[in-house]
C-alpha cells in the first residue's frame, strides 16, 4: 500500500498535447491543476480520469481498458471512464473525471467535472424492505452496507459486529501495517463519522445468539431481539486454534482482527526470535512482516513446499527461496507438538526458541449461527446464484458462503477479501429484490517483501500447469488447467495478462 506525494508527471494538459501523441487505445498520464490525470483514447473519444486507483493508489495507466472502463493493474478494481464510478471492489470510491476538448489537432483538459451522485438502484418488483440487518463487520458486511447507501436505499441498516473496531482493511493487517510500513490511520475502511452520516447503525462488541427465520428476528446475547425484513450473514471465518499444549500462552497469537495485529506488533517490539506455524498465505505474509522488523523468523509447516497445493511446485520453490533470501528459516514436513514457555517443540524431535509464536494453520467458516437457524450448511452456508440461503430473505456472503461458481461449474467457497466485498455488493442488490446472479471471477493477491502474487479464478483439482516466463526472474504467468480448460491464473509482474485472463473468464461465463 503506497501513497505518492511526488510532483505530477507528464505534460501540462491545460496547455494541450497533439492528438497524434495519443493513439487509438492508448493511455497517457499528464497533469492538470496539480493533479495527475490519465488520458485514454477510444476511437474519436478521449476520456480524462484520475490517474490512480482509489484503493491502494495503483497506476491506472498500467491497467486494462475494457469497453468504457479501466481496470487497476494491482488488485483488479474497475472504474467507469464516463462517470468515474467504482464499478467493482476493492475500490469503493470513484476517480475524478475532467472535461476534454479537441481543437486544432490537439487535446486539452479543461476542468474537473462535478462528481455525479451514484445512480439510485432501480426499483425491482415488490415491496422494498424497510429493515436490513447485517451480521458481520468484515469485507462483505461493510461492502453491503456501503453499497446500499451508495445506491440510495433509504431504509434501516443495522450492522452487528463482535469486533471491537469498526470495519478495517483486513489484508493490511498481515502486510504493511504489521510490517510497520503503514500507519494505523490507513487501516479503517471509513472514519467513524461515515456510519452516523450514512445512518448505518454499527453495533460493535455485539454477539448474535440466534435467528428466528419464521418471525424474522435476530436474537442478541443481551437478550434483545432485532426484527428484519432482509438479513445478510457475513460472519466470515476464524483462525483455527492450535490443538497442542501451551497454545494458550500470552506470546502465542493468531491473526484476524486489528486487535490481533496490534498485539503481535506490541510483542514484536520486545522479541528477538519468532516462530510462525503454517506456510500458507497468512503465515508467510506474517513472516515477511516480522523480517521487516528485523526479527529472526522460523516457519514450521507440514508441507513439502509452501503453497504447493494452490500455486504448484515451481512457484512453491520460488516462494521458499524468496523468503530464505530474506533470512527466513524453514522447518518443513514438521509440526509443533507443544509450546513450553519459549520453547516450541517439534513433532520431528527438534526444539525452537521463540519470544513470539504466530499460528497461521488455516481458518474455518463461522457457520454456527446459520446451523442453529436450520439453514443448509455443507462446509459453508449453501446459497443459490443470488446468494440467498435456504431460508427466504436470508442471504450469505463472504468467507462463509458456498455458491455455484459458473466458471468452474462447482459449488465453491473461497476466503478472499475481494470476493467477499463483491459478494456483499451483489447481496445488497438482491436483498432489495433484484435477481442478479453473482458471477464474479475470484481474485486475490498476496505480498511477500516487494513481490506481489496475483491469482485469478479458482483452480481446485487442477491436472495441468502451463508456465509462461521465468518464475526465478520474477516475471511469469502460470495457467492452472483441468481437462485442458484454464481454471485459474497466477502471476508475478504480469499485471495486464492477469487482467486479460480475468476478462477472458468473465466472457467465458457469459457465452
For every predicted segment, state its role:
Residues 164-165, 171-188, 262, 271-273, ...:
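Rossmann-like dinucleotide-binding cores of NAD(P)H-dependent redox enzymes
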Residues 128-201, 240, 287-310, 500:
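Beta1-alpha1 glycine-rich phosphate/pyrophosphate-binding loop at the start
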Residues 32, 154, 190-220, 225-226, ...:
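A Rossmann-like FAD-binding core segment of flavoenzymes
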